[in-house]
Each structure stands twice: as C-alpha cells, then as structure tokens.
Amino acid sequence: MNAVAPLPLPADAADMFDLPRPAAESRIVVAMSGGVDSSVVAALAHASGAEVIGITLQLYDYGAATGRKGACCAGDDIQDARAVADRLGIAHYVFDHESAFREDVVEQFADDYLSGRTPVPCIRCNMGPKFTDLLRMARELGADCLATGHYVRRVAGEHGPELHRALDPARDQSYFLYGTTETQLDFLRFPLGDLPKTAVRELAEAAGLRNAAKPDSQDICFVPDGDYAKIVKTMRPEGGTPGDIVHAQTGEVLGQHKGIVHYTVGQRRGLEIGGQPEPLYVVGLDAAASRVKVGPKRLLAVQAASVIETNRIGPLPDVPLTAKVRSLAKPVPITLDGSLGDGATTRITFEQPEFGVAPGQAGVIYAGDRVIGGGWIDSTESAA
C-alpha cells in the first residue's frame, strides 16, 4: 500500500480540530459514514498527528426496510469506510445500531407521515444515534473530541462554543443540527465547515481515498429511491387507506386519494383533480378522517407557527432573529414570543407571510450565521 501523501491544507491540520493538548498526545474519534466528507475528516485527523479511531454505525438494512432482498446500501457504505480506514492505517470499529435507529428514527418517520405531518428524520438521527450514542462511544474510547463531516462551523464565543452556518451556503447543514446541546458542542468538531465541496474532493483525491468521486447522497438514507410512501405503507399498511380530496374553502369533494402518506403540505403534483379554475395545492391533511384538503396557493401563506420541544444553544442575543422552516430555504426575519430551550414551546411570527410551512418540520432560529436553536413546528396560523 502506498503511503498517504501530505495533504494540500489551507491551515495546519491540528488547528482544524482545536485540540485541548498537543496533537501527538491526543485521540480523535471520527464518525465515518462511508461518504467522501467523513472520509476526508478522517484523513485530516490522521494528518494532524493525533491518534485516530473511526466509528461507523450500521443503522439500517434497506432490503429489510422495503422488502427487497439483497439491497443493503448500508453494507456498501461500511465497506467504503473500512477501506478508507485501512488506507489511512487507523483503527475502525462498526457498531450495530439498527434496532435503536429503527425505533427512534424510522418508526417515528412512519408515524409522522401517518398523522399527516412532514417529518425530518435526519434531525432525529442527529439528536439520537449520531450524536448521543457516538459521543458516548467516543468518550468511552478516551477521545479528546468527536469529529464529523457535517458542513457547519464551531466558533469560539464569549460564552463558549457556538454553532454557525458553513461558509459555503450551498453545503450548509446547520438546519439539521439545531438540537445539538452545549455539552455536545463542546466535544464536537466540524473541520469541513470552512471548506467548499470542491476542496474536500481535492483532498480526498490527494489522500488516495477510493470514494473520492462517490456521489453525494440525495435522499433520506433509509429511503434511497425517494419513495417515502412505499416504506411507510410497508411499515404502516393503514397509510394506504383511500379517502376524499376536498376543497378547503367550499368543502366540495373533488376526488379520491390513495392514502394520505402520498401527500405533504404544499404539494401540487399527483392530485389528479383536473378541470379546476385555478391551480390547487395540498393545504392541510386530516389524518383522522383520511382527508386531503386542497386550495389555492394563497391558503399556504403562514403568519406564525407554534414550535414545541425547543432547544437553545447558548444565550439568546438581543439582536434581530431569522428562521428557516426547510433546509434549503433562506432564513427570513421573525419575532420570537415565549421561552426558547429546555423543551419549552415558543411562537415565531414571520415578518412576511411564509409559504410551505407544515407541522412536523423544524423551525430553526438564527442570529446572523449563528444557530440559536429551534424545535418542531406543531401548528401554524394562516396569513390568508
């Protein structure tokens, strides 16, 4: 095996991990998913001179989840992670977390869809297996920190570490990490937060990693084909119960649907209710009655939202705040009414009506680039 060449780094590798002691005396645990991002983090950690241990969680078997045989995407990712660890000459451990992942993430995903909500399972995964469990393992292994391939920044603040958006807005993943606690953030490191994706792939090539050109994942990991309804109906057959499609304003029955799991708030395609005088969108889901409510786009305008089970990272600053209700949305100005953090319920009011806000999504609050916290959207108030 050829030695790993020195990496073309913009800074000293050890400085990218903010280690509490000299790198030669430190131990870094890296969460390795098998993708190029976490693999480059492992290469950076190795280049720092610290002892490096890679950990991969086996979270799901796609074949079992969908009823298809011999389709275990997770297994391929584990092999990629192991190959990278071998290339770098670092220890690598795989832990079976399928049962916990199914209970904490996949089952909740199915239940949310069944209740008419729009789930964000990646956030629940970060709150559970990825951070809670990995952090515990890293500490048990005597690590000085746990490093991940997330595109966010950990910035030293007046009151301790702060979570900030990545410098590359196209890669920023801060929306998914609002649930990080202050204690967790103190131990976590995100060395990719200052880098564009192009630089990360160049580093992977320089290190000779076999997954340097591996495509980015585009879908939820346990739904790689993007067919959410299929996996929900496999787990919850009642999700395929048909029902009425009704006009939210007139109450008129416009057609029939094949199960509310096929629909989310804001959806327009797939309604199969042609001949209407104006375009209609899904504006609400009545799970108890198995009813899909549709209406004109103006009914999707939301003025405020109730956000539950909130988390706060550090003190709340006395500055203008913004919020995101979808990962790819731009933060928009808001006002906050109520406590934020410790599981409290708060209310966010949008300066301008916001579209596409649905129960089950996360409402993530920012002060500039800093993530203040957030919670789950429980209900909305129409601006129409």
Curated annotation (Swiss-Prot):
The yes or no answer to whether the keyword Disulfide bond is present is yes
Concerning CDD domains, the annotation shows: MnmA_TRMU-like (cd01998)
Q: Name one GO cellular component term.
A: cytoplasm
Taxonomic superkingdom: Bacteria
The record's GO molecular-function terms, alphabetically, read: ATP binding; tRNA binding; tRNA-uridine 2-sulfurtransferase activity
Q: What class of enzyme is it?
A: transferase
Region: Interaction with tRNA; residue ranges are: 171-173
Catalytically driven reaction(s): S-sulfanyl-L-cysteinyl-[protein] + uridine(34) in tRNA + AH2 + ATP = 2-thiouridine(34) in tRNA + L-cysteinyl-[protein] + A + AMP + diphosphate + H(+)
Q: Where is this site: Interaction with tRNA?
A: 150, 361
From the Swiss-Prot or TrEMBL record, state where the protein is found.
Answer: Cytoplasm
Keyword Ribosomal protein assigned to the entry: answer is no
Where ATP binds, per the record, is at 31-38, 57, 149
| NCBIfam families (alphabetical) | PRK00143.1, trmU
Name the family. Answer: Belongs to the MnmA/TRMU family.
In Swiss-Prot or TrEMBL terms, this protein is called tRNA-specific 2-thiouridylase MnmA
Q: Which organism is it from?
A: Erythrobacter litoralis (strain HTCC2594)
What is the gene name? Answer: mnmA
